[in-house]
Swiss-Prot record:
Organism superkingdom: Bacteria
Keyword ATP-binding: yes
Protein name: Aspartate--ammonia ligase
Protein's UniProt keywords contain Amino-acid biosynthesis: yes
Keywords: Amino-acid biosynthesis, Asparagine biosynthesis, ATP-binding, Cytoplasm, Ligase, Nucleotide-binding
EC number: 6.3.1.1
UniProt-listed CDD domains: AsnA
Gene that specifies this protein: asnA
Gene Ontology annotations for the cellular component aspect, listed alphabetically: cytosol
GO annotation, biological process: L-asparagine biosynthetic process
Pathway membership, UniProt: Amino-acid biosynthesis; L-asparagine biosynthesis; L-asparagine from L-aspartate (ammonia route): step 1/1
Organism whose genome encodes this protein: Parabacteroides distasonis (strain ATCC 8503 / DSM 20701 / CIP 104284 / JCM 5825 / NCTC 11152)
A GO term, aspect molecular function: aspartate-ammonia ligase activity
Family affiliation: Belongs to the class-II aminoacyl-tRNA synthetase family. AsnA subfamily.
Length: 345
C-alpha cells in the first residue's frame, strides 16, 4: 500500500533546472570516485535475463519479476532484473577480472511489487558493483574497509554539492558508525527494525548495520535476504553472524533514516549450501548460476548496490524520490505531493 510523508513547511531548495544539473554532476562525480576507491571498471549491464537460470535477484523472496515472452526463442520467458547481484559475479568470471579489481554498472530495474512512497518507486536505478577478493579476506575488517571507502566517496560528493549550491550545507559525519543487528536489537529491544534503524542513524548520522538476513536472539531477522548472494550466515572472527549489511544516513528533510546501499561479502560454496538449506531452497542448486558457483567457476567477491536516485534525493534535500526520477505514481499521491510542495516528475 502506498504512503506519503509530508514534511511540514517543505519547500524545494532547487528549481527543476538546478535539480537536473545537480543530478548530472552528482552521478558523474560519485561514480568516478567509486571507481577510483574500489578499482572498478564500467561494464554494460542487461535490462532483462532469461527466467529459470537463477541469475535474477530474488530480493526478499516474495517480489514478482516483470516477465515477457520472446518470440524468437519459442516464447521462452525473460525477466526484467531486480538487481544484478548474481549477474555481476558471473561477469567477473567471464571477464577474468583479477583479485583486488572489479566492475560497476548503471543498473535499471522495475520492481512492480514495491509499496510506493517517498523512498520507493517502481523504477530502480543504482550503481551495481562487484569486486574480486581472496578467501582470506572473508572477514568483518575487510567488509568495513570497503564500506569506509564507499562512504569516503559519499562525503566528497556532498562537498561537491555544497560548492554548486551553497544553500545546501553538508550534514554527513566524517566517519561512519558500525553496529551489528544483534547489538542494535539489544540497544533497542522494544523497537521494530525500522524504529531501531531510525534511532541509531539519528544518533550517529551515518551507520552501517552488519548482519542482515540472519536470525537474531528474538527469533526474527532484522530484514530478509535471498540465500544466494550475500553471506549472512557465516560466523565472523568477532563471533557474530553475517558478512553483509546496509548503509544508512539520517535524512533531515523526512526526519528518518534513508538506506543508500546494501552490500556484502558473497557466499562461498559452504555458505551457499547452508543458506539454501536454511531457506528450504535446495532445488536452486540445479540452476545455472548455482551450478557454476558450486563447481568453483566463480571467484570469491564482495559487492552491492548504491541507489542513484536516493543518493541524489539526499544530496539535493528532496522530500520525494519522484522529484529526482520519472516514474508512475497514484494520482492521489501526485495531488497530495503537489499540495505539500513536492513536484513529482
Amino acid at each position: 500500500m502506498s504512503y506519503l510523508i509530508k514534511p511540514a513547511g517543505y519547500k524545494a531548495l532547487l528549481n527543476l533546472s538546478q535539480t537536473e544539473m545537480g543530478i548530472k554532476k552528482i552521478k558523474d562525480f560519485f561514480q568516478q570516485n567509486l571507481s577510483s576507491e574500489l578499482r572498478l571498471r564500467r561494464v554494460t549491464a542487461p535490462l532483462f535475463v532469461l527466467k529459470g537460470m537463477g541469475i535474477n535477484d530474488d530480493l526478499n523472496g516474495t517480489e514478482r519479476a516483470v516477465t515477457f515472452p520472446i518470440k524468437d526463442l519459442n516464447d521462452s520467458k525473460a525477466e526484467i532484473v531486480h538487481s544484478l547481484a548474481k549477474w555481476k559475479r558471473l561477469t567477473l568470471a567471464d571477464y577474468h577480472i583479477e583479485e583486488g579489481y572489479g566492475i560497476y554498472t548503471d543498473m535499471n530495474a522495475i520492481r512492480s511489487d514495491e509499496e510506493l512512497g517517498n523512498l520507493h518507486s517502481l523504477y530502480v536505478d543504482q550503481w551495481d558493483w562487484e569486486r574480486v577478493m581472496s578467501e582470506s579476506e572473508r572477514k568483518i575488517d575487510f567488509l568495513k574497509e570497503i564500506v569506509r571507502r564507499i562512504y569516503a566517496a559519499m562525503v566528497r560528493t556532498e562537498y561537491l554539492v555544497y560548492e554548486m549550491f551553497p544553500q545546501i550545507r553538508p550534514t554527513l559525519p566524517q566517519q561512519i558508525h558500525f553496529i551489528h543487528s544483534e547489538d542494535l536489537l539489544q540497544k533497542y529491544p522494544t523497537f521494530t527494525p525500522k524504529e531501531r534503524e531510525d534511532a541509531i542513524t539519528k544518533e550517529y548520522g551515518a551507520v552501517f548495520i552488519i548482519g542482515i538476513g540472519c536470525s537474531l536472539s528474538n527469533g526474527e531477522k532484522h530484514d530478509g535476504r535471498a540465500p544466494d548472494y550475500d553471506d549472512w550466515s557465516t560466523i565472523a572472527e568477532n563471533g557474530q553472524t553475517g558478512l553483509n549489511g546496509d548503509l544508512l544516513v539520517w535524512d533531515d528533510v523526512l526526519n528518518r533514516s534513508m538506506e543508500l546501499s546494501s552490500m556484502g561479502i558473497r557466499v562461498n560454496k559452504e555458505a551457499l549450501l547452508r543458506q539454501l538449506d536454511i531457506c528450504k531452497a535446495g532445488e536452486k542448486k540445479e540452476l545455472y548460476f548455482h551450478k557454476r558457483l558450486l563447481s568453483g567457476e566463480l571467484p570469491q567477491s564482495i559487492g552491492g548496490g548504491i541507489g542513484q536516485s536516493r543518493l541524489c534525493m539526499f544530496y539535493l534535500r528532496k522530500a520525494h524520490i519522484g522529484e529526482i526520477q520519472a516514474s508512475i505514481w497514484p494520482e492521489e499521491m501526485r495531488k497530495e505531493a503537489r499540495a505539500a510542495g513536492m513536484m513529482l516528475i
